[in-house]
Amino acid sequence: AANTAQDSGASLLIGHANNGAEIVANSLVLMPSADYARQICGAGSQLARMVEAYRQTDPFGELYVIAVPEATGAAATVTLTVTGAATETGTVNVYVGRTRVQAPVTNGDNVTTIASSIKDAINAVPALPFTASSSAGVVTLTARHKGLCGNEIPVSLNYYGFGGGEVLPAGVQIAVATGTAGTGAPVLTGAVAAMADEPFDYIGLPFNDTASVNTLVTEMNDTSGRWSYARQLYGHVYTAKIGTLSELVTAGDQFNQQHITLAGYEKETQTPADELAASRTARAAVFIRNDPARPTQTGELVGMLPAPKGKRFTMTEQQTLLSHGVATAYVESGVLRIQRDVTTYRKNAYGVADNSYLDSETLHTSAYVLRKLKSVITSKYGRHKLACDGTRFGPGQAIVTPAVIKGELLATYRQLERAGIVENYELFKQYLVVERDASDPNRLNTLFPPDYVNQLRVFAVVNQFRLQYSEESA
């Protein structure tokens, strides 16, 4: 067969649009650019920000979005309380998520004037996830969307500090505090219905509460979901959570699902969790489309602001997160990078430790191999008759036998081996079984036991140093 085509590996982002936005809720929309997302979802909306974060890493990949209605609940608020009059002219640098907002301050400005300047500067940037109001020296930021997701939009002052040229004007103090916590989570059943049977290899989910994740767990499951024999759509869900070590461990322990990657980030991370989820989805898409078996480690999350030095997880803490099914990231030279994309799967049905689905690359490799097999069989034997081995049919007959299919699968395995997807051909050949079903004469049963290549993650060295070798050099 001449077929060498591959699936496009489309991505999907789920999130909120602004009230009154052009996009229709719970409908699948092709999203070519961040500009188009702002146009139809609304500037500052969750979806617009997620698309922007996604496109910073994957500018060319096929991307769809689904806008979901807001939760029934409360919108998160953050307060900035100004104290002290300015004794010099300067600038207040407020970071709302990844965006720096600069508010001018003039020598002699009082708290009310400074707060008003901050409010005006924030409201002048429509792409922000908050709107601002001020009164008596207090600036109140209110999330554009109701729900828990507003609690994971960081606000801080002077992210880069003195070394980065960011300091408060003399005489001015500003305290940043959490106001009203956002409450409520959206109902995702409409979004799942909108997905229908469209294939999405990479799904970015901004909602990390247990019920929301479990809705996607059901959609992805192996029995009746996207990974079932009946649907064969496959795909993987990426979500993110910002929190303390204990909060993230608790979150990871809520799940035991191989089709979900929950990435954990430090409390002081200066990027909203929804944008982190979108960025990690994009990074996986770019890497996995190119090679599903190659590890995503070191992948740059472009434009994402990490926690500052001294506020990042230690290696021991990162290992703890991984042990509880939470994917990790690290920072090198100020750049946030993927450390390991584990899934939340840790135990089998008996509660015994199981690393079969530890790494998301294993699942992506499985999807790649299964699609390859389907492509080979349907392209070459789409309208063939089935006969037993040894049948003496004439030349030109479109007939296939178990031995023919077995030979085809062995040839395909060699192709996968050359592509660096599988290994151990001889053992695979030994264990491969293709036989005609005893009850259904139109069916071939195949036991296909691939040995996937793995990822280099640990390089162990015993450094047995010597001050001087006593033997003469050879």
Indicate where each model-derived feature is located:
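Generic alpha-helical secondary structure
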Residues: 111-115, 119, 213, 398, ...
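Structural signature of extracellular appendage/secretion-system components
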Residues: 1-87, 91-100, 105, 143, ...
